[in-house]
Amino acid sequence: MAIANKNIIFVAGLGGIGLDTSREIVKSGPKNLVILDRIDNPTAIAELKAINPKVTVTFYPYDVTVPVAETTKLLKTIFAQLKTVDLLINGAGILDDHQIERTIAVNFTGTVNTTTAIMEFWDKRKGGPGGVVANICSVTGFNAIYQVPVYSASKAAALSFTNSLARLAPITGVTAYSINPGITRTPLVHKFNSWLDVEPRVGELLLEHPTQTTLECAQNFVKAIEANKNGAIWQLDLGQLIAVEWTKHWDSHI
């Protein structure tokens, strides 16, 4: 998918990886970039507008933990203005295994609910045009950081959901792929809580090993968007973009 002249909704587009990705997206010249985020950062929005004045950058406050009906109402407003939306990026995430319910609500349920809400406008069974979903998951969905099992499990769930979305594309007209960053130097990673405090220094320990910058991650994110491969499981790690081949251990045969 060429980003130029497209309409994009980016959930959590002002976070660590999110903001750098938003910068790279506007450089590529979409028609509209609509950012939905809990963070109200007028300075960042102004910066994005200045990077490419031809791009219309809009911000709406949004918490992914709200009910689907509230998300649908917000999307109705956005679709009324834009008429069409080409890409939804679900990027909300927290890393704090002390907050069990909220971790699951933000990292998994929020992704499911936002995607479910946009299907009202995209699903070809309802006369919709289809669309593309890019879900930010994590390499911990492949192999857990066992000291943060709640976070890791929430990302594995988001990855599984995304894989299923891709398989449903012939029915819904909506394609999907996952973005799975490795350890990226963001405020999220510097200090966070392990489950039951099993490892108080887990953030420090991770940063003792090779990492990537948010810019490296963002640049590869844009490459993944442009590749637009339904069902792709993209690993964005150490400045590299790698298509992961998923090993099938079981099949439902339906």
From Swiss-Prot:
Position of the signal peptide: none
Enzyme active site: Y151
Top-level taxon of the source organism: Eukaryota
Record-linked CDD domains: ADH_SDR_c_like
SS bond partners: none
Alphabetically ordered keywords of this record: NAD, Oxidoreductase
PANTHER family named in the record: 15-HYDROXYPROSTAGLANDIN DEHYDROGENASE [NAD(+)], ALCOHOL DEHYDROGENASE-RELATED
Enzyme class: oxidoreductase
Binding residues for NAD(+): 10-33
Reactions the enzyme catalyzes: a primary alcohol + NAD(+) = an aldehyde + NADH + H(+); a secondary alcohol + NAD(+) = a ketone + NADH + H(+)
PROSITE patterns hit by this protein: ADH_SHORT
One GO location term (cellular component): cytoplasm
UniProt-annotated binding residues for substrate: S138
InterPro entries listed in its UniProt record: ADH_Drosophila-type, NAD(P)-bd_dom_sf, Sc_DH/Rdtase_CS, SDR_fam
Gene3D superfamilies membership: NAD(P)-binding Rossmann-like Domain
Protein name as annotated: Alcohol dehydrogenase
GO MF term (any one): alcohol dehydrogenase (NAD+) activity
Protein's GO biological process: alcohol metabolic process
Complexes and interactors: Homodimer.
EC number: 1.1.1.1
Family classification: Belongs to the short-chain dehydrogenases/reductases (SDR) family.
